[in-house]
Design a protein with these regions (language model features):
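Basic/aromatic-rich interaction segments and small domains that mediate binding to polyanionic partners
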Residues: 4-42
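Intrinsically disordered, low-complexity, charged/polar segments
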Residues: 32-58
């Protein structure tokens, strides 16, 4: 299950993206962890190109 605020790491570039908003049923708006590098992607595409990073728990 994907939700706003989830972090994903691109498998090819190593960049970390955060889900900022969801548009429609399948489109996600991602923003780079440092505030740069925005992109739109589908949920299916995100699962193929990125891996979800688990939240840090103390």
């Amino acid at each position: 299950m994907m939700k706003i605020g989830d972090r994903f790491k691109d498998k090819t570039t190593g960049k970390i993206f955060i889900i900022r908003t969801e548009m429609g049923n399948d489109t996600l708006y991602l923003e780079g962890e440092n505030g740069l590098g925005r992109r739109l992607t589908g949920k299916k595409s995100l699962n193929q190109t990125c891996e979800k990073l688990e939240d840090i728990k103390s």
